[in-house]
Amino acid sequence: MKIGIIGAMEEEVNFLRDKMENRVATTIANCEFTEGQIGAVQVVLTRCGIGKVNAALATTLLNDRFQPDAIINTGVAGGLNASMAVGDLVISTEVRYHDVDATVFGYEYGQVPGMVPAYLPDATLIAAAKTAAQKVGFHSEEGLIVTGDSFMGEETRVNEVKTLFPAAYCAEMEAGAIAQVCHQFQTPFVIIRALSDVAGQDAKMSYDTFLEKSAVNSAKQVMLMLDHLSA
């Protein structure tokens, strides 16, 4: 089994890279790919850069050049649900865009014309993520993750997104693009995000303080997922 793992920033991938053996690094179009092994699992770890275009580019290259059996996106996000706190984990059961509006043409809000309204992660990967979350001991929830090309630090926009997507647990900047590309390639995927901040509530201060810790929380869950998938 070969698993592709994508993180946007160095803080989101360095913990996993340090755990890899037999590493071989390649850079394509400013996207960093590191092949190697974590335990019994062959891994291609990808640092894609921030935002939807960077994420789509890296996910396309990952699928085309390395052909993984599945893709896991790890990283941090801004929380949208009052029941969750910084450091908690969100496991995707659905991924949508919060910054796409083609409703005038009859599409759902968040739906890219010609594409599905929501991208659904693989059930086996969701189950593995849930098992890993229980083992690692972090509080986790499963549900909707929304994506857009903006940091959710402005209270008015946060409230707009909450109104549009009341079921959303968190917002971030890459998952929707990763999910859309995986949908096109028919590659199973799941998104794992740890909360680095609560969107709109001193979000930047919290993000700066908790980025690395939350990123490691997400990466630790991915490590346990790999153990489960290789069993």
Swiss-Prot record:
Specify which residues bind substrate according to the UniProt entry for this protein.
Answer: G78, M152, M173, E174
* Positions of the catalytic residues: E12 (proton acceptor), D197 (proton donor)
As recorded in UniProt, its EC number(s) are: 3.2.2.9
GO BP terms:
L-methionine salvage from methylthioadenosine; L-methionine salvage from S-adenosylmethionine; nucleoside catabolic process
- Read off the InterPro entries from this record: MTA_SAH_Nsdase, Nucleoside_phosphorylase_d, Nucleoside_phosphorylase_sf
State the reactions this protein catalyses.
Answer: S-adenosyl-L-homocysteine + H2O = S-(5-deoxy-D-ribos-5-yl)-L-homocysteine + adenine; S-methyl-5'-thioadenosine + H2O = 5-(methylsulfanyl)-D-ribose + adenine; 5'-deoxyadenosine + H2O = 5-deoxy-D-ribose + adenine
Keywords, in A-Z order: Amino-acid biosynthesis, Hydrolase, Methionine biosynthesis
| Domain of life per record | Bacteria
Belongs to which family?
Belongs to the PNP/UDP phosphorylase family. MtnN subfamily.
Q: What is this protein called?
A: 5'-methylthioadenosine/S-adenosylhomocysteine nucleosidase
